[in-house]
A protein has these predicted regions:
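Generic serine detector
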Residues: 2, 31, 46, 55, ...
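Anion-binding (especially nucleotide phosphate/pyrophosphate-binding) glycine-rich loop
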Residues: 2-135, 143
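Phosphate/pyrophosphate- and phosphate-bearing ligand-binding catalytic cores of soluble enzymes
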Residues: 21-22, 28, 73, 160-288, ...
Length: 305
């Protein structure tokens, strides 16, 4: 019996109320709108269900991959022979026990978390309002924008380490740096939830700041096209988009993938891009930038096999 047939039986017995689907097109669940089918996709509703599911999937060799909003990942056109664990049902955000604290589950969107904080009169997450990812992915990569990043406001993170169990780490233990954390080096680890320590503020002033940042984002970024956001990390001392623009690469196209003419830091799907188009275009950008400037660009987008 294959791993997925065994998992079919197990989920029916132990997680009968959890949504569980077969041969799911991944393009539906990624911001690039690219990707073949996942052999199986599960939608746990709680940390307990997720821990139980991932533990069993590992035992069966299902190579579970935990997917949030799918904003920083690219799946191959032939799909993946593994279990994709979709956290969309784990989207709760609430006040914490400590003053000025909120708790967000891994599947909550960064935007919804920022709006929750704003309505509660808590400041510190304004920068996150326009970031399209989920809390789990955002914490893992220390997401940020416009001078803010999650490391500035995180109090603790509860993580499933398959070989150690569930642990709660404080901000110092997370070893945050630019678009990096301890979890970047531990891809098997899964963020379950995070606690954020914010500052009191006036809801209307917080809302105004959020709207200003969103207006800047809409004016400068190609939000009308599918993409994974910033394609490359910022090299030390440089801006990736400026280097790409400097090299004359705006509009460069491979198949259905293109360097945005609005923002050179974005590779966009013009409507028919394949995974191979995007990866080939990224490689060509890296090659030309390296040749012309000497700077090596590091991808921010993860290609999942």
């Amino acid at each position: 019996m294959s791993w997925y047939e065994e998992l079919d039986v197990w989920t029916a017995d132990y997680l009968p109320d959890m949504a569980y689907e077969k041969d799911v097109p991944l393009r539906r669940y990624t911001s690039f709108r690219i990707g073949g089918a996942a052999r199986r996709m599960a939608f746990p509703r709680s940390g307990e269900e997720l821990v139980l599911l991932v533990s069993r999937a590992l035992e069966l060799g299902a190579r579970p991959f935990v997917l949030g909003n799918g904003t920083n990942v690219l799946f191959p056109d032939e799909g993946v022979e593994r279990l994709v664990v979709n956290t969309r049902e784990m989207n709760r955000v609430c006040r914490g026990e400590n003053e000025n604290e909120i708790i967000a589950e891994c599947g909550a969107s960064m935007a919804n978390m920022a709006v929750f904080a704003q309505k509660e009169g808590l400041s510190g997450l304004e920068f996150a309002h326009g970031i399209p990812g989920s809390v789990g992915g955002g914490v893992t990569m220390n997401a940020g924008a416009y001078g803010g990043e999650l490391a500035q406001v995180i109090e603790s993170v509860t993580v499933l380490f398959p070989d150690e169990g569930v642990r709660t780490l404080n901000a110092g233990e997370m070893a945050f740096s630019y678009r990096h954390s301890l979890l970047t080096e531990r891809p098997e680890a899964v963020v379950l939830r995070a606690a954020f320590r914010l500052q009191p503020g006036k809801p209307e002033e917080i809302r105004k700041k959020m709207d200003e940042l969103m207006a800047r984002r809409k004016a400068s970024q190609p939000l009308e096209y599918p993409s994974a956001g910033s394609t490359f990390k910022r090299p030390e001392g440089y801006f990736a988009a400026a280097l790409i623009d400097q090299c004359g690469l705006k509009g460069l196209t491979v198949g259905g993938a293109q360097v945005s003419e609005k923002h050179a830091g974005f590779v966009i799907n013009r409507g028919s891009a394949a995974c191979a188009d995007v990866t080939a275009l990224m490689a060509e950008i890296q090659r030309r930038v390296k040749a012309q400037t000497g700077v090596e660009l590091e991808p921010e987008v993860r290609v999942i096999k």
